[in-house]
Regions:
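Core nucleotide-handling region used for phosphoryl-transfer chemistry
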Residues: 1-266
């Protein structure tokens, strides 16, 4: 990846750490190739594979249709405990938002059918793949249904007045919050047949299509921390009583999270 461009290919589908499957669209009349890394097998120092959190290509054309933001790296994992007072980040180079814990859903436009489609990590068509009979899979379907209820009109995404205003050249990544069931737009990517280009939040949050969506689509709360060291950042997160923050690089879109110390124990 260079300067916010993610070049993506089906060629990685044979790697052991990748899950590859053929999925259908909502109407059942088109197929997709979906690539998603298996978090139990992937090595997270492999930046190339980390890009394939959930990527959708047309089948059999192999053209990129949808890109999901790569998994967020926990910044604390890179900090030596003895260096917690040393500078680890330059705030002016990042956009800082509240961390939203929830289910990620990706909205994209299929150029073959001229219809909007919905993808989650392991499936398309607005349905969750039930993996290993885990209860979390059933919970995920609930949040998919919440997404549809908020954006569909008369049961159809294509009739939604909000979606009608969206650029069809982009894919949109939402998180349906586990805490308040609100729908947050967390990432936008310009889609080309070969690559996805990162769009800054400071840009898309001011697009006209999002001017009158209050209460339907939310943006994560913005923070302006001057803190540079891990010790100071963690104190800021604790002081604001939030789950954590996400630092997004303004240059290439790479994301790092800093979680509140009680986040993993509550």
């Amino acid at each position: 990846m260079l300067f916010g461009y993610y070049y993506l290919s089906m060629d990685v589908s044979a790697r052991p750490s990748m899950e590859y499957k053929i999925t259908r669209n909502y109407a059942g009349d088109r197929l997709f190739s979906l690539l998603a890394y298996d978090k139990e097998l992937v090595t997270f120092n492999d930046d190339k594979i980390k890009c394939y959190r959930s990527v959708v290509f047309s089948f059999p054309e192999r053209k990129l249709l949808c890109f999901s933001p790569p998994s967020i790296t926990t910044l604390q994992n890179f900090i030596n405990p003895r260096d917690r007072k040393s500078n680890c980040i330059e705030p002016s180079k990042y956009t800082t938002n509240e961390y939203i814990d929830g289910l990620m859903l990706n909205l994209f436009f299929d150029t073959r059918t001229f219809r909007w489609e919905l993808a989650v990590k392991y499936n398309t068509g607005g349905k969750q793949r039930y993996r290993y009979n885990k209860p979390s899979s059933y919970l995920a379907q609930r949040y998919i249904d919440i997404f549809k209820q908020k954006l569909q009109y008369e049961g159809d995404l294509m009739k939604s007045p909000i979606i009608k205003m969206l650029s069809t050249d982009h894919s949109y990544s939402f998180v349906c919050s586990y805490r308040d069931e609100k729908l947050y737009l967390v990432a936008v990517y310009e889609i080309n047949e070969l690559y996805a280009r990162f769009v800054e939040a400071n840009d898309y949050e001011h697009w006209e299509c999002f001017a009158n969506v209050n209460g339907v689509i939310c943006f994560p709360k913005r923070y302006y921390f001057d803190s540079c060291s891990m010790e100071e950042i963690e104190m800021d997160v604790y002081r604001h009583n939030i789950d954590g923050v996400v630092y997004t690089s303004n240059d290439d879109g790479k994301r790092y999270k800093v979680l509140n110390y009680w986040y993993n124990i509550r």
